[in-house]
Amino acid sequence: MAQANSRSRNSATISYPEKRRARVNLGKREVEILKTPYLLETQIESYRKFLQKDIAAEKREDNGLHAAFKSVFPITSYSGYAVLEYVGYSLGGESTLFDVEECKLRGLTYAAPLKVNMRLVIYDKEAPAGKKAIKDIKEQEVYMGEIPLMTETGSLVINGTERVVVSQLHRSPGVFFEHDKGKTHSSGKLLYSARVIPYRGSWLDFEFDPKDCLFVRIDRRRKLPATVILRALGYDTEQILDMFYKTNHFHLNQETVTLDLIPQRLRGELAVVEIKDKKGKVIVEANRRISARHIRLIEKAEINKLELPDDYLYGKVIGKTIIDKETGEIIAHANEEITAELLKNLRATKTASLDTLYINEIECGPYVSDTLRLDTTTNQLEALVEIYRIMRPGEPPTKEAAESLFENLFFSPERYSLSAVGRMKFNRRVGRKELTGLDVLSKEDIVDVLRVLVDIRDGKGDVDDIDHLGNRRIRSVGEMAENQFRVGLVRVERAVKDRLSLADVENLMPQDLVNAKPVSAAIKEFFGSSQLSQFMDQNNPLSEITHKRRVSALGPGGLTRERAGFEVRDVHVTHYGRVCPIETPEGPNIGLINSLAVFARANEYGFLETPYRKVVDRVVTDETEYLSAIEEGDYYIAQANTNVDEKGRLVDDLISCRYKGEFTLTTPDKINYMDVSPRQIVSVAAALIPFLEHDDANRALMGSNMQRQAVPTIRPETPLVGTGMERTVAVDSGVTVIAKRSGVIDSVDASRIVVRVDRKETEDDDDIGVDIYNLTKFTRSNQNTCINQHPIVEVGDKVQKGDVLADGPSTDIGELALGQNLLVAFMPWNGYNFEDSILISERLVEEDRFTTIHIQEFTCVARDTKLGPEEITSDIPNVGESALAKLDESGIVHIGAEVNAGDILVGKVTPKGETQLTPEEKLLRAIFGEKASDVKDTSLRVTPGITGTVIDVRIFTREGIKKDERTLEIEKAELSKVEKDLNDELRVREDALFENLEKLLTGRVAAGGPNKLAKGTKITKSYLADLPRQKWFEIRLQDDAATKRLEASHEHFKELRETRDAKLKDSRQKLTQGGDLAPGVIKIVKVYLAVKRRIQPGDKMAGRHGNKGVISTIVPIEDMPYLEDGTPVDIVLNPLGVPSRMNIGQVLETHLGWAAKGLGKKIGEMIEKGADAKELRKSLKPIYDLSKTQRFDLEALEDPEIVTLAKNLRKGVPISSPVFDGATEEEIKQLLKMADLPTSGQAALYDGRTGKKFDRSVTVGYMYMLKLNHLVDDKMHARSTGSYSLVTQQPLGGKAQFGGQRFGEMEVWALEAYGAAYTLQEMLTVKSDDVAGRTRMYKNIVDGDHRMDAGMPESFNVLVKEIRSLAIDIGLEND
């Protein structure tokens, strides 16, 4: 990945773009400890783990495809005599047939074939019992469909469109304890429940009912007493009671009972008798409640026996079954209540002692004991049958069926898996030390869950918070693709099992057993139509990055919009540093779709973690550690802006920190960690908003979302006031071209850059590396915006690995540039900025500041129809010459033609159905072969409302069909482009080769050679210069070593030429081979139109602080308010938009922007006066010295570089004010002072129309404004006549259908109220659904007769038909 390590260079070297234009950083914090991580890491890393493409088969880890295969294979036949084993897999032997760009053009999926090595083992049936003898082993590679590959930028190309698979935030597998918040029962009693959620398999729920009995549900079915599942696990009543209760031991006397006393257990009870110590002193009086003080006294007196009356035992529960030792009969069952009669029986059978359950309202409730009484089952089999009846109602249970069903529910690895995450979470929650174990449940697991649940009901322990990020995990692309793949494999498994059981399995090969269709169908379905596989948002680089970093709680296995409550959507304390609290959509999805914070990443288990700096003994170290939400709770974590001295010691006595999810103050010695950066808590989009800390959260949310909708302008301009994130975003998004290796620029033109790579970067000494970068020119993005790259380097420039060589859309010298810096004034202007309207100057239109290019794609498909093939041709029936003027002889529009709505782009005719011909016509056709009458014109035309220039045409023809002139022409042009690249590469390499040869040959003694080179003469440079290069190899030298090197060079020379020819041949074959088109398609023509959209009233604009508005009018430059020096402002905003919305950041940005522009102006004046590099260096130093930290090193630049830098700063000195660490009021004032501007940030303005000064000074400055992708051109729509609905005959609605305006019920009332009868009649008849009337009307207008006679509206006929359908005969009576 070129981008992945683009920023791994040491910070000492200044990158090429930074030398051209560096930002003044006003952040207060010292140098960033942790560089911003590669922003697309989540996607790329996840998919890399899934494919494990470049890892040898035996070294692959247990995840992704490998894990899916291992979990399904080996597949054994029902008899057990044949086994299909999985050995390994490989992805795409050669490189994929088409690269990403070609796949996009041809509408293909960018994928690699998956070949799996399988082994079929057949065992001998005749072998003696108990021994397995192998009869035959066959190994074979089986093709299992195509697996989509990820592009370098983390997207996938599916059917020619770029898509992104959004990560999902779902509930982690494991066990969760919760209560119903008192909503279930009218009393408001809290009912506790436990739920075991597996990664796949049945859910297991335990719950209390209002009577405190425990119940179990499997897969949310009908509930059963919880003890049924314990019995099904093989426990009997006594064991169950033993697991949940302690017992009290009683000795039976003739009249009384003696209790073996454990004093603690008396707490809270009423004393039935007086309790005395050995001396007879009363400790507790009768009928008093026993308190903790009493218990201490009892323990002190060492009383361990207590004689109690019989009635103390009544109502207590027997803990162990009591058996008559003589007869062996059962006197009392476990869990039976003691009555007077039972005691009498016990004494009669001479039972000496008994155990009762220790049940106490305070710490040990009778829940399990009560549940056992509800449980009708008595043994394991009955319990299994009961469970079977719930899961399979209506089926007769058998012992085997019941046992296998229960076994498969929770204990079979095929049907149930907790996964490593689930097991870790489960063990942690039930308090076990080891964090690994089986993926299925065990008896102990189920018992432990019940134990914890009972403890929580008894008040020991807390319920879980399901919105805690320790209980929600991220599922990324790789994991979701793996799950889909497994689903496909399981479908294959069933088919393979059946085939393995066939008699002739010995003659089959693995290929015959495996059908790859279900697997590729599952993968295709996932990438093509899953809710989480989305059409990539490609408005601008930021929207791409944000889309790839998005985290959604929706999707399969997630929440639904309707069911998600307030808690799930809310910001949670654990979001800190993991998920952005600001960036989320407005509307129904708010809070369900989030964005990863800048530094967040998912750990091995899929939980989000965020980095912190370690603090040891009050000293902040440079060591960083990633903590997940679970680990974070136990530490004191200080904020990033905590005061620290030079040695890194914490200075303050009390430090604001976070502990257990609360914000608190504590002493410095308790602090364990500290935030890495102030922008740690926000996402990429929010981190691009300067002065975010001064904006209200709601507006910041809008600001983050609107930056993603900015359309790339023709001339991007980086913001004067940024945050320092701009470069990172531009580089990581992959829209710029980045140097793969260091080197020198060899040649540059608008569409490609050739770099001669530095020697140290090439693997081979002889080989001189050449990197050729082809730039993307005017390509259409998913949102129809324009992707265009242009170089920023010049020939001879030295570039380092990772430097930006060419800017893409919305980037300016390697920095993100979504909009334009405009001179803004906050003031009202004749009501034109009422309610967020925006007033702009005509200058913005003149200078094309917000002109954008949109590229529309039109596709024309010629198919084989039943009546014959459609034909693409310029011979179209009933079309005038003028309409065909822009087409070539093949019927396809010329490149460069300017077309308007309704113009033909591709001429196409379709055969018409045979019409009944008269005998005369038949004769004529037989004689002349006249065919024109039976085709109809189905040409591709430009849709209404679009005018533009044709910039590209692509033609795809089916194999075996003759290509037309135009296709051959396009192929020829493409080929010459490839040839030029290969020739350039060859030229650079050959130049280097001959350069080395010249060094080798010059001054050597020759042994003969061409051009009469005598033996023994020295070779000179002039001799070599006159000799054609090819002939250098004919020179013979006396030195053997040198001769060998010359021969080696000759070989290398030949090799270079051969490689070039082979590559050219390969490209030619790729270009000329026919397209793989859908069945029935003969030819596809794609025409690309570039539409230039200037800014105009009705377009939506916005700043970065959520300050959005619509342009109300464009005012001539001379009428705009102007400053004292005559500069007219560019844009006028309403000052009332600031106070109520509380986004003050825009005002601070305006002031700082003005200062930045003012400094730039001063530098510009110096350059105009002819200042040299020394003077410029002197004046730039104080500006760059404003940076407290991360200071830009001017000394590292050479003089010419200083001059270039100063020239680039004329438009304004770019400043970065990082989020939550921005410029202070004092700094802004200081900068304004340096720029010789008023420190109030306000200036006197003059009215452009009258020349008079306005009464008050106005806040003026530079603000960064964006043009959003809500353009009035896309919304404007007008219709004369068009398509009508079939049933009602009324015009369709909406722009896409070329529909009309709805004239609804209320509009009718309005006309009725005015008594406008004729207008109303016209609206409801001829303008709508009076079919005959509207045809007559059209005819009348054409004849110049403007009368109207309305007939019967079609909707009346529909009404008549509907009434008739109710069997009521209704009809119109004609007088």
Swiss-Prot record:
Any one GO molecular function term: DNA-directed RNA polymerase activity
Reaction(s) this enzyme catalyzes, per UniProt: RNA(n) + a ribonucleoside 5'-triphosphate = RNA(n+1) + diphosphate
Keyword Transferase included in the entry's annotation: yes
E.C. numbers: 2.7.7.6
UniProt cross-references to Pfam families, sorted A to Z: RNA_pol_Rpb2_1, RNA_pol_Rpb2_2, RNA_pol_Rpb2_3, RNA_pol_Rpb2_45, RNA_pol_Rpb2_6, RNA_pol_Rpb2_7
GO biological process, one term: DNA-templated transcription
Cellular component aspect of the GO annotation: DNA-directed RNA polymerase complex
UniProt KW keywords: DNA-directed RNA polymerase, Nucleotidyltransferase, Transcription, Transferase
Superkingdom of source: Bacteria
HAMAP family from the UniProt entry: RNApol_bact_RpoB
Protein task: DNA-dependent RNA polymerase catalyzes the transcription of DNA into RNA using the four ribonucleoside triphosphates as substrates.
Subunit structure of this chain's protein: The RNAP catalytic core consists of 2 alpha, 1 beta, 1 beta' and 1 omega subunit. When a sigma factor is associated with the core the holoenzyme is formed, which can initiate transcription.
Family: Belongs to the RNA polymerase beta chain family.
Annotated PANTHER family: DNA-DIRECTED RNA POLYMERASE I SUBUNIT 2 (PTHR20856)
Full protein name: DNA-directed RNA polymerase subunit beta
Organism of this sequence: Coxiella burnetii (strain RSA 493 / Nine Mile phase I)
Lineage per the UniProt record: Bacteria, Pseudomonadati, Pseudomonadota, Gammaproteobacteria, Legionellales
Gene of this entry: rpoB
